[in-house]
């Protein structure tokens, strides 16, 4: 203890001497620098926050989000709602993915004042506030307590529904495309809904699944839904997708719903057709689809659809489908030298590269089969299919840079609430960047 006191006094004395000297000139590997102590100055690591806060003030997104929040405290020492949501916003905007990272913001004396806050809360206070917004009913509770928690959860859901709808409302007044996808969120604890299922990044690791509904080319999230790890099939996100479509007016409906092979099944397509909603999905390469490709391959009416692709359309009704549907087959010849990677189990997973030279008498093709409920031309469908890859960049950004891969708690309710909050802040930031440009 004595040595620690001595070290503390030495540090304090050195700092006081440096402050008395005023400006210091230091020689560093990068050149000469001047160091000056400023007792009254404040600093923030979030340099762009002031510009984003101006957008929030003009648009009123943050003010309405705080004003409609169903969080209510009874203790006189409880934090203000603006402090809770402001801390949450700053954490998301800083690129954090754990509640414990909030502690790194507490030394910021500028950011709270910009958002009209009094202070930045601790990570534990933020967790407790979110548990009050999205309560998880314990195993042992009365029916009255369970009903009260369910009512609070319904209020929070409506609150986020309204906030997300306001954040994308202007984008729905022009023709747009709704991209649907599923993101796997690996978990490293004992969380509710953590189940071992499809996980391409961490096979065998429990996970949650984030069903995402994305406004194509606008970099806006229409909604997000976190479910348990085995709910990665499209049928688990279909109810929410239908509610979103039915909640939009006819003028705001998407021109097209687009998805990968997970959505190319009869259940999803039948629901879209019942809503008179156009769609474009990819089909799995099942035996019936392969026979279709074989029948179409020798046709002479293949049409070029740019970027080396050629297309032809047909009608297909697979076993289990309720009706025949329009399909489009795309193909493109693969040119140049190819490399095939093979893992040998006998050599403990060692990789072996096989070099294949494409000759003129050997034609290699890449192909895909699309099913659609639209009357677009083949060239338009080919372009729409290629544009689908652009939304993957947005999903990757949200998961790896905006916190969709984190903010994990033991209950599923707060995980779901956090994912939607990340989507909301992301939408605001996207609008802010667009107005700045």
Say what each PLM segment does:
Residues 109-112, 185-187, 220, 230-231, ...:
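Flexible loop/turn segments at secondary-structure boundaries
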Residues 181, 254-264:
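Acidic/histidine-rich, metal-coordinating catalytic segments
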Residues 425-437:
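A short, flexible helix-boundary coil/loop motif
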């Amino acid at each position: 203890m004595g040595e620690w006191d001595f070290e503390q006094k030495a540090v304090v004395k050195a700092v006081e001497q440096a402050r008395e000297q005023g400006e210091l000139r230091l020689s560093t590997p990068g050149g000469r620098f001047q160091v000056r102590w400023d007792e009254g100055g404040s600093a923030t690591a979030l340099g762009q926050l002031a510009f984003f806060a101006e957008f929030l003030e003009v648009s009123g997104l943050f003010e309405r989000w705080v004003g409609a929040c169903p969080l209510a405290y009874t203790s006189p020492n409880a934090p203000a709602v603006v402090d809770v949501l402001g801390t949450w916003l700053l954490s998301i905007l800083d690129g954090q993915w754990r509640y414990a990272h909030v502690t790194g913001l507490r030394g910021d004396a500028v950011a709270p004042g910009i958002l009209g806050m009094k202070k930045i809360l601790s990570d534990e206070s933020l967790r407790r506030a979110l548990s009050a917004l999205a309560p998880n009913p314990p195993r042992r509770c009365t029916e009255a307590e369970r009903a009260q928690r369910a009512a609070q959860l319904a209020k929070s859901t409506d609150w986020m529904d309204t906030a997300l709808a306001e954040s994308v409302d202007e984008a729905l007044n022009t023709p747009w495309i709704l991209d649907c996808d599923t993101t796997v969120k690996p978990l490293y604890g004992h969380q509710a809904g953590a189940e071992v299922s499809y996980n391409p990044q961490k096979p065998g690791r429990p996970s949650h699944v984030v069903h995402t509904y994305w406004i194509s080319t606008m970099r806006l999230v229409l909604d997000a839904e976190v479910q348990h790890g085995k709910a990665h099939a499209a049928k688990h996100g279909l109810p929410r997708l239908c509610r979103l479509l039915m909640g939009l007016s006819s003028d705001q409906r998407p021109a097209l719903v687009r998805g990968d092979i997970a959505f190319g099944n009869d259940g999803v397509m039948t629901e879209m057709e019942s809503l008179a909603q156009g769609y474009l999905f990819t089909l799995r390469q099942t035996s019936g689809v392969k026979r279709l490709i074989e029948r179409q391959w020798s046709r002479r009416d293949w049409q070029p659809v740019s970027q080396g692709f050629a297309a032809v359309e047909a009608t297909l009704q697979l076993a289990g489908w309720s009706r025949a549907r329009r399909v489009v087959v795309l193909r493109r010849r693969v040119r140049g030298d190819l490399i095939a990677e093979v893992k040998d189990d006998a050599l403990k997973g060692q990789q072996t590269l096989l070099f294949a030279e494409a000759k003129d008498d050997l034609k290699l093709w890449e192909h895909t089969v699309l099913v659609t409920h639209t009357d677009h031309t083949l060239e338009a469908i080919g372009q729409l299919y290629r544009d689908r890859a652009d939304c993957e960049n947005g999903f990757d950004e949200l998961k790896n840079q905006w916190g969709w891969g984190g903010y994990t708690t033991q209950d599923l309710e707060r995980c779901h609430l956090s994912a939607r909050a990340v989507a909301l802040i992301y939408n605001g930031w996207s609008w802010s960047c667009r107005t700045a440009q």
